């Protein structure tokens, strides 16, 4: 892979809104695109690691905003053990972690930050 457009020792992270382990309830094209992003990120992580470039994914859960349908929010929240949808601020620490030296030995990973949604509710 051509690295000419990326300086060495950089961090790249992408956002993938579902864990690759969770079956999306959307059209097949959505699933194909999301799984492709996971595969592409892992490919780049493997190819660029020796150049000091780390590539990781952040898989956030649903983010609440006041435009969301209340019935949708209630239905989704029942599947989140923490009991609420995320706020944008809930992801700041994860993004800082992925872009910092604290994750220097991490590449090709998918960091799931979803309030426990992928483990299911009790």
Positions of predicted regions on the chain:
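Short C-terminal tail/terminal secondary-structure segment
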Residues: 15-18, 96, 107-122
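Short-chain dehydrogenase/reductase
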Residues: 41-42, 92-95, 99
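Short, small/polar-rich loop/turn modules that mediate ligand/substrate recognition or access, typified
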Residues: 49-54, 106-108
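Conserved functional loop/turn residues at catalytic and ligand-binding sites
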Residues: 44, 52, 84, 101-102
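A conserved structural motif in NAD(P)-dependent oxidoreductases
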Residues: 80-91, 102
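A glycine/serine/threonine-rich, flexible loop-to-helix segment
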Residues: 8-18, 50, 57-80, 90, ...
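Conserved SDR Rossmann-fold cofactor-binding beta-strand/turn motif
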Residues: 1, 54-64, 99, 112-114
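Catalytic loop of short-chain dehydrogenase/reductase
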Residues: 1-50, 62
């Amino acid at each position: 892979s051509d690295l000419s457009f990326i300086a060495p020792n950089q961090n790249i992270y992408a956002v993938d809104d579902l864990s690759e382990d969770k079956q999306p309830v959307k059209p097949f094209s959505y699933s194909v695109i999301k799984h492709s992003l996971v595969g592409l990120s892992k490919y780049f992580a493997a190819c660029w690691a020796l150049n000091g470039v780390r590539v990781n994914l952040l898989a956030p859960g649903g983010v609440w905003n006041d435009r969301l349908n209340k019935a949708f929010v209630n239905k989704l929240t029942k599947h989140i053990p923490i009991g609420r949808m995320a706020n944008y601020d809930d992801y700041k620490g994860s993004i800082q972690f992925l872009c910092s030296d604290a994750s220097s030995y991490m590449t090709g990973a998918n960091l799931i930050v979803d309030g426990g949604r992928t483990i299911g509710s009790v």
